[in-house]
Amino acid sequence: MNPFKGRHFQRDIILWAVRWYCKYGISYRELQEMLAERGVNVDHSTIYRWVQRYAPEMEKRLRWYWRNPSDLCPWHMDETYVKVNGRWAYLYRAVDSRGRTVDFYLSSRRNSKAAYRFLGKILNNVKKWQIPRFINTDKAPAYGRALALLKREGRCPSDVEHRQIKYRNNVIECDHGKLKRIIGARLGFKSMKTAYATIKGIEVMRALRKGQASAFYYGDPLGEMRLVSRVFEM
C-alpha cells in the first residue's frame, strides 16, 4: 500500500521536510520558509501533519538498518525530561559505550513499570546473543527491579550484570544534550501521542547521523537521503 496515496505533494518533498525537521533544531514555520525558497508553498500546519504521519513510519522502516550493534558493547541507560502539555514526561534512552543508539521509550511516569517496559522493548528487538554482559544505569532502584523481573521471566540472561557507576553514564548524558538541543526548538508537545511520533523521527535521524546505517551508504555523501527514500519504495 502506498503511504503517500492521495497526498497533494510529491513523496520526495514530504520526506525531505520530515527528515530535515527531525534532524535539525528548526521550527515548522522555519521549515515552511525554507520550502518556500525552493518553490514549494506549503503551510506549517501541513508539515506538522506530515511529521505526525511519516516520522513514526520512517523509524519503523529504518529500524532494521540502525538496529542494535552486535559487538556486545555495554549498554548505558538513563532518562531525560520532555515537556508535554505543560508537564514533564520521561524519555527513557539507551546507548552503547560508543554512543550508538540502542532504543528509547517515552513514558508519563518514572517508576519501575516504565523501566520494565523500556527494558522489555529493547529485549524484544534484539537477539539474545546481542545482549551485552553489562548494563549500566544510575542509582535509581527502578532499573534493578525491572532487570530482576525480566531475568525471572527468562527474557533477560541471568548472567547480565547490572552496574550503577555514575561516571560511566557520561556517554548517555552527553547524548541527551545533543538530543535536547534538537527538541528544544519545539517548545514542548501538546500530547504524548504527538510527542512520541516526533521523537521517533528525531531518534532515528540521530542514529543515522551517528553512522549506524552507514554500511548501506556505500560511501555516498547523499546516502542518508537515498536510504530514507529507498525504504519508502518497498
Functional labels for PLM-detected ranges:
Residues A197-M234:
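C-terminal domain-tail junction helix/linker
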Residues N85-T101, N111, L119-L123:
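Short conserved beta-strand segments at catalytic cores or DNA/RNA-binding microdomains
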Residues A17, L31, I47, M77-D78, ...:
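Mobile genetic element proteins and their domesticated derivatives, centered on retroelements
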Residues S27-V40:
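DNA-recognition alpha helix
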Residues R53, F104-K128:
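Active-site beta-loop-alpha junctions of metal-dependent nucleic acid enzymes
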Residues R49-S70, E153-G154:
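Short, basic alpha-helical nucleic acid-contact segments in DNA-binding proteins
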